[in-house]
Each structure stands twice: as structure tokens, then as C-alpha cells.
A protein has these predicted regions:
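Accessory terminal helices/loops
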Residues: 98-108, 117-168
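Short, conserved glycine- and acidic-residue-centered signature motifs
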Residues: 3, 86-89, 165
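Active-site HxH/HxHxD metal-binding segment of metal-dependent hydrolases
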Residues: 1-49, 136-139
Length: 168
């Protein structure tokens, strides 16, 4: 239910198709395709498993392109961070992050925002002795100095460095 402003204009101008979680059907303007948790969504030349991952919003979903080992996590999981909780609960966010942790470690993670450097600084405050995190920060700083995005990350890197995925 986040980032839906402009749906009507995009549909009108480009003929876009609006896709969203079935539970948000009344909240998302102009929704065309309703998706459910664990559904395999096939369109054109791809298929993705839909994962309902509430926490940031109650209807947040991610798209797991399992054959390619790519997941789009939107605003639930960021590189070295996680999203703010707007509608959900901390328990829901924790469960959603644990759901993502079950994917193969070599899964590439594409998140909704490039907050990696700030997230790295936050992680370092609480996990300063983590050697993997120190290496990751060096890599991030070099990438950002050269104007290169830090995304995608991998689940393996996140499991080693992201304090929110390391929480128990």
C-alpha cells in the first residue's frame, strides 16, 4: 500500500498493469492483478513466487524469482537494514525477515531504496567487531565514491552483516 501514488496516471499514459496483494485490493487504486501469499505468478517470460511479508505495511509482498535466485524485497529488507514499520508490528516484521532468511544464500536481493551506506554505519555501532561487516563497509564506500549502486546484495552477505537478519 506504500508507493501507490500515480497508479491512475501511469495506467492512463502507458497502459500499465497494477499488481498488488489481494488483501490490499480496496486500498490500491486501479489494481488489475490480485496476488496471494505463496502464489506462483506467471507473466510474459517469467515466474515469481509471491511472498506476503507484512511489517512495513500490512499488505507488503515480495517477488521471489526462484529460478534466477533473485528477490525484490521492496521496503521490508534493505541492504544492511530493514524498513520502518508503518502498519505492521515488530513481530510481523521479525517473522517476515525470517521468511526471507529461508531463501538460498546465493539469492540476489534487490531492495526499494539505496540506504546501504547509512545502514552500514548503523550496523557498525552495534556490531563493530564483525570482520565481514568491516569488509562490506569498505566495499560499499568504494562503490559509492564511484557513483556505483551497492544493490544487489546477496542473502549470504546480509546474513553475515545485517543486524536485523542476525537478530534472534
Amino acid at each position: 500500500y506504500d508507493h501507490i501514488g500515480g497508479n491512475q496516471e501511469l495506467k492512463k499514459k502507458y497502459g500499465s498493469v497494477v499488481v498488488g496483494f489481494k488483501g490490499d485490493s480496496r486500498r490500491i487504486p486501479e489494481i488489475d492483478i490480485l496476488l496471494e501469499d505463496n502464489q506462483i505468478w506467471k507473466a510474459e517470460n517469467f515466474e515469481a513466487k509471491i511472498m506476503h511479508i507484512p511489517g512495513h505495511t500490512s499488505g507488503h509482498i515480495c517477488f521471489n524469482f526462484f529460478k534466477e535466485k533473485i528477490v525484490f524485497t521492496g521496503d521490508t529488507l534493505f541492504s544492511l537494514g530493514c524498513g520502518r514499520i508503518f502498519e505492521g508490528s515488530y513481530e510481523e516484521m521479525f517473522e517476515s525477515l525470517n521468511k526471507i532468511k529461508l531463501l538460498p544464500e546465493d539469492t540476489k536481493i534487490y531492495c526499494g531504496h539505496e540506504y546501504t551506506l547509512n545502514n552500514a554505519k548503523f550496523c557498525k555501532k552495534y556490531d563493530s567487531k564483525n570482520k565481514d561487516l568491516q569488509k562490506k563497509i569498505e566495499k560499499i564506500e568504494k562503490l559509492r565514491e564511484n557513483g556505483i549502486p551497492t544493490i544487489p546484495s546477496t542473502l549470504k552477505e546480509e546474513l553475515e552483516c545485517n543486524i536485523f537478519l542476525r537478530a534472534k
